[in-house]
Amino acid sequence: MTVQRIFRLSSVLRSAVSVHLRRNIGVTAVAFNKELDPVQKLFLDKIREYKAKRLASGGPVDTGPEYQQEVDRELFKLKQMYGKGEMDKFPTFNFEDPKFEVLDKPQS
């Protein structure tokens, strides 16, 4: 009986979510079709151009050799500061269990 209630509740939730999503998709489609003013259009064009350059170069755009030297210098500082480990993965820790002395309880 509870399984039937769960299935009924899940179907009600699924239909409510689908109606909500349909409404939101309809509203966003109208919002994205509006015309942009010229300044917004230029701004978006520049962002898209920058993204294309960044993807083509595979890294930062419009940087010289000074930038790469600075990055290398900072990475060297980090390696010196944090133990010269691999910077791309999480470090592994080895914790040893503490050794306790067993003390005899004095009998009274």
From Swiss-Prot:
Localization annotation: Mitochondrion; Mitochondrion inner membrane
One Pfam family hit: ATP-synt_F6
InterPro entries noted in UniProt: ATP_synth_f6_mt, ATP_synth_f6_sf_mt
PTM annotation (N6-succinyllysine): residues: 84, 99
Chain positions with Phosphoserine modification: 108
One GO process term, biological-process aspect: negative regulation of prostaglandin secretion
Record bears the keyword Lyase: no
GO cellular component: cell surface; extracellular space; mitochondrial inner membrane; proton-transporting ATP synthase complex
Residues where N6-acetyllysine is found: 41, 46, 79, 84, 99, 105
Coiled coil residues, start to end: none
Transit peptide endpoints, chain numbering: 1-32
Principal location: mitochondrion
Keyword entries, A-Z: Acetylation, CF(0), Hydrogen ion transport, Ion transport, Membrane, Mitochondrion, Mitochondrion inner membrane, Phosphoprotein, Transit peptide, Transport
Highest taxon of the lineage: Eukaryota
GO molecular function: protein-containing complex binding; proton transmembrane transporter activity
Subunit structure comment from the entry: Component of the ATP synthase complex composed at least of ATP5F1A/subunit alpha, ATP5F1B/subunit beta, ATP5MC1/subunit c (homooctomer), MT-ATP6/subunit a, MT-ATP8/subunit 8, ATP5ME/subunit e, ATP5MF/subunit f, ATP5MG/subunit g, ATP5MK/subunit k, ATP5MJ/subunit j, ATP5F1C/subunit gamma, ATP5F1D/subunit delta, ATP5F1E/subunit epsilon, ATP5PF/subunit F6, ATP5PB/subunit b, ATP5PD/subunit d, ATP5PO/subunit OSCP.
PANTHER family, alphabetized: ATP SYNTHASE COUPLING FACTOR 6, MITOCHONDRIAL (PTHR12441), ATP SYNTHASE-COUPLING FACTOR 6, MITOCHONDRIAL (PTHR12441:SF10)
Family: Belongs to the eukaryotic ATPase subunit F6 family.
Cited function: Subunit F6, of the mitochondrial membrane ATP synthase complex (F(1)F(0) ATP synthase or Complex V) that produces ATP from ADP in the presence of a proton gradient across the membrane which is generated by electron transport complexes of the respiratory chain. ATP synthase complex consist of a soluble F(1) head domain - the catalytic core - and a membrane F(1) domain - the membrane proton channel. These two domains are linked by a central stalk rotating inside the F(1) region and a stationary peripheral stalk.
Name of the protein described by the UniProt record: ATP synthase peripheral stalk subunit F6, mitochondrial
The species this protein was found in: Rattus norvegicus
